[in-house]
């Protein structure tokens, strides 16, 4: 047990027998005043030369290592690849620097293990036989052969005895490839005997000729001598490529002292590439080892970013479609309000969704593709695969939005139908009025009908008014019209649409009230107005009357007919204008009869209201100034400004009275409140008897 402890401490480890190293543990001790360690750069704290010399003397004199944390305090964690390049300060002049020639077998083995741990095969392989020739004992040769066999199987696997603070690495993210170690076997990695081996680090400091040691930061030297390193297990960077995916095969090995040590041998694997073993390439292992993880994280973030971009793109497309449909619906409602008779039904089918992005797979949920027939739609809470960035869960919400819009459109249709229902009685009344007028127009007497037939025969056509006969009459009356205007007049006169203007069509045109009033307005406006094809026959008739081209009885019948029509038409026109005005008001503003009454109140109604108020308030409220009759009828010479001004106090009231008024007239209207009720009552009794005599 003493030999094991001695070998453990001399090997520069901080392993306590009986404790099992935790493979994923990485301990970095930070204190105030200590500068942070840059990844890939190791800081090794060394004591003074005198302190190192004293410790070496103590260790060589006692034949064993120093006990306790003093020896361990001089080391600090650092990457294992930089420990091979460190150069320790020279010892005192009396001390001899260590060389590759071993003082004892354990020193050479330790140096070999250090070199094999760092993967420096090109520098060590040729030197291996020379070191073996210098060994004096067969036991040491046997240990070297055993070590070479182990190196041949996995030369990059560091021994368990070297897994201490001297070989501590800051690669915390490689804890998953740490090889398991048995708790009580410090020298089991190479099967070395536990007996006569003296430590190399405890005796003479090992020289690292390639690089000078970094200067420790101020304050770090004092703190490094007081820190105790907990047990931890690390792996050299070479194990990442050689044994990260190969399990170790532990096996029992008999040592010289009779103890049984577990030998951990990795499975044979390919050698690491030379650029990994290169010292210049391994100065920043954290960056090199973090590179495989960055693409994975970048790929994950890129996928998430693509998913978010696809989601936002679909969301914006949904919003654009919804806004466009909303604008179309608004325009449709505006057109429906302008022309309520031409309402178009709302399509009940839901609108087609926009095309999904190219990243989304073609096989999506059936309810996402509304146009294509398929199985029943999935529920709202159905799970969607994470690899599809198409936001299919937004479709039910969009459907709900369309339902709301349909409901709003239906509500607008209801309001329009209600307004239309209110307008229908007025329109029906107008239609009835037109029908009654047409019935009255159709009811012609025999004399009136004979008079219009005689006018029809003037055109001298073959039983109808044709283009040639109409053109001849127009030329006779002095009208200059084009053939196109003649054709338009004939087409307008063809009421039944058979292509011929017979007497029935001619009679319907001449008895049409609208055409008659249109011709009257056209003649009243200006004589230079262009000829209207719809009223061309009415324009010819007055000229015939002036020329006395018709018999006197015919002219009298036609003249009387149109005079009655004009008189009845003016009254009906007024009624029509009033009805049309009411319709326009109902379309713009709701009809309120009380508002119309309040806007136009007749004078008699105002007087009746005043008399009613006077009768109600005269008896109980005689003292109130508002119940008293004003002095306007009794004072015709009073100034208008005085009358309009409201009397506020007795001084103003006295000024308002003219000096011509008698005191008995002034007293009942401008009496002070300080007078008694008796005097007021006596004066008020005198007023009704005097008013009728003066007003009549």
Curated annotation (Swiss-Prot):
Stretches assigned to the EF-hand domain: 481-516
Name of the protein this chain belongs to: Spermatogenesis-associated protein 21
Record's keyword terms, sorted: Calcium, Coiled coil, Metal-binding
Alphabetized PROSITE patterns for the sequence: EF_HAND_1 (PS00018), EF_HAND_2 (PS50222)
UniProt cross-references to Gene3D superfamilies, sorted A to Z: EF-hand (1.10.238.10)
Superkingdom of the source species: Eukaryota
Organism from which the protein derives: Macaca fascicularis
GO MF annotation, one: calcium ion binding
Biased amino acid composition, Polar residues: 96-116, 223-235
């Amino acid at each position: 047990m003493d030999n094991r402890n001695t070998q453990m401490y001399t090997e520069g480890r901080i392993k306590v027998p009986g404790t099992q190293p935790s493979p994923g543990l990485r301990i970095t001790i930070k204190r105030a005043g200590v500068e942070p360690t840059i990844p890939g750069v190791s800081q090794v704290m060394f004591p003074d030369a005198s302190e190192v010399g004293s410790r070496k003397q103590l260790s060589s004199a006692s034949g064993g290592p120093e006990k306790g944390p003093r020896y361990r305090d001089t080391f600090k964690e650092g990457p294992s690849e930089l420990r091979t390049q460190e150069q320790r300060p020279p010892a005192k002049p009396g001390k001899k620097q260590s060389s590759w020639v071993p003082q004892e077998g354990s020193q050479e083995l330790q140096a070999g293990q250090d070199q094999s741990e760092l993967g420096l095969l090109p520098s060590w392989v040729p030197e291996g036989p020379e070191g073996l020739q210098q060994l004096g004992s067969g036991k040491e040769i046997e240990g070297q052969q055993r070590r070479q066999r182990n190196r041949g199987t996995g030369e990059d696997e560091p021994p368990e005895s070297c897994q201490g603070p001297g070989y501590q690495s800051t690669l915390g993210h490689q804890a998953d490839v740490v090889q398991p170690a048995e708790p009580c076997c410090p020298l089991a990695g190479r099967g070395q005997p536990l007996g006569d081996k003296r430590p190399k680090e405890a005796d003479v400091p090992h020289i690292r000729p390639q690089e000078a040691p970094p200067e420790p930061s101020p304050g770090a030297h004092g703190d490094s001598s007081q820190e105790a390193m907990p047990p931890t297990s690390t792996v050299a960077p070479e194990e990442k490529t050689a044994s990260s995916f190969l399990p170790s095969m532990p096996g029992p090995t008999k040592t010289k002292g009779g103890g049984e040590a577990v030998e951990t041998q990795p499975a044979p694997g390919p050698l690491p590439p030379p650029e990994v073993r290169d010292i210049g390439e391994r100065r920043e292992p954290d960056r090199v080892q973090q590179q495989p993880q960055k693409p994975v994280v970048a790929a994950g973030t890129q996928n998430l970013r693509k998913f978010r971009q696809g989601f936002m793109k679909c969301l914006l497309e949904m919003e654009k479609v919804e806004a466009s449909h909303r604008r179309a619906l608004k325009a449709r409602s505006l057109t429906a309000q302008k022309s309520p008779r031409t309402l178009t039904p709302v399509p009940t089918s839901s609108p087609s969704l926009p095309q999904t992005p190219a990243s989304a797979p073609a096989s999506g949920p059936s309810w996402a593709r509304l146009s294509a027939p398929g199985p029943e739609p999935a529920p709202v809470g159905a799970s969607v695969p994470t690899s599809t960035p198409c936001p299919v869960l937004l479709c039910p919400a969009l459907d709900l939005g369309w339902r709301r819009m349909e409901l709003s459109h239906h509500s607008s249709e209801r309001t329009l139908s209600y307004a239309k229902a209110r307008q229908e009685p007025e329109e029906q009344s107008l239609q009835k009025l037109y029908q009654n007028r047409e019935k009255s127009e159709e009811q012609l007497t025999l004399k009136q009908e004979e008079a219009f037939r005689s006018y029809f025969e003037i055109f001298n056509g073959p039983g109808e008014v044709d283009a040639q006969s109409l053109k001849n009459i127009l030329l006779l009356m002095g009208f200059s019209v084009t053939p196109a205007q003649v054709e338009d007049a004939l087409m307008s006169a063809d009421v039944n649409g058979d292509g011929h203007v017979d007497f029935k069509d001619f009679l319907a045109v001449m008895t049409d009230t609208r055409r008659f009033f249109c011709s009257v307005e056209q003649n009243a406006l200006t004589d230079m107005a262009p000829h209207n094809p719809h009223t061309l026959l009415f324009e010819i008739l007055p000229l015939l009357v002036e020329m006395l081209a018709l018999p006197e009885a015919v002219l009298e019948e036609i003249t009387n007919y149109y005079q009655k029509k004009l008189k009845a038409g003016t009254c009906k026109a007024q009624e029509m204008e009033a009805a049309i005005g009411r319709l326009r008001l109902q379309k713009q503003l709701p009809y309120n009869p009380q508002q119309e009454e309040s806007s136009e109140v007749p004078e008699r109604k105002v007087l009746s209201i005043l008399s009613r108020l006077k009768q109600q308030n005269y008896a109980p409220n005689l003292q109130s100034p508002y119940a008293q009759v004003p002095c306007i009828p009794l004072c015709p010479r009073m100034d208008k400004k005085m009358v309009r001004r409201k009397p506020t106090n007795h001084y103003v009231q006295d000024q308002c009275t003219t000096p011509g008024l008698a005191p008995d007239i002034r007293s009942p209207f401008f009496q002070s409140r300080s007078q008694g009720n008796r005097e007021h009552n006596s004066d008020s009794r005198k007023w009704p008897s005097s008013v009728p005599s003066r007003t009549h």
